[in-house]
Amino acid sequence: MSPKFMFFSIIAVWSCAAVTEALFIQHRSLANFFFMTLTAAKRSPQEYDGYGNYCGWGGEGTPVDSIDRCCQVHDNCYGTVNENECGHYIRNVKLIDYDWHMEGTEIVCDPKDDACGRALCKCDKDIIDCFNENDKDYNPEYNKVIG
């Protein structure tokens, strides 16, 4: 086997392993917010994804209503947590796992998580509470994905 072939084979295997690990971490961590929404929000996660200017990936402009404002606050919360509690992590805070559970209708963040995990859980808990408090303002026409 030529050294060149061996080198490119190692690079290919390493690249595939890195991508697989990144996808696993992202799937696991984004699952927290997905399942929290699925479990505790009045609407499905799909009804919020792509809603207004801030719900989903990215965000800019003026929120279209109180639901979209919840997403803007959530984006800002993640930004603040990324700079403060999670500042020691190299990767994006959206990829960090945390534990939570339900007690009745209340979301409870695991106090055993580190400061970063607890803060991220609180960001996600707060947006679910905000969604539920403002559910009357939900307008399907603002959902770019399903509306």
Swiss-Prot record:
Uppermost EC category: hydrolase
Residues at which Ca(2+) binds: 56, 58, 75
Signal peptide per UniProt: 1-22
SMART domains given in the database record: PA2c
Pfam families membership: Phospholip_A2_1
Intrachain S-S bonds: 55-71, 70-130, 77-123, 86-116, 109-121
Reaction catalysis annotation: a 1,2-diacyl-sn-glycero-3-phosphocholine + H2O = a 1-acyl-sn-glycero-3-phosphocholine + a fatty acid + H(+)
Compartments, as annotated in UniProt: Secreted
Annotated protein name in UniProt: Phospholipase A2 SSD1043
Protein species of origin: Scolopendra dehaani
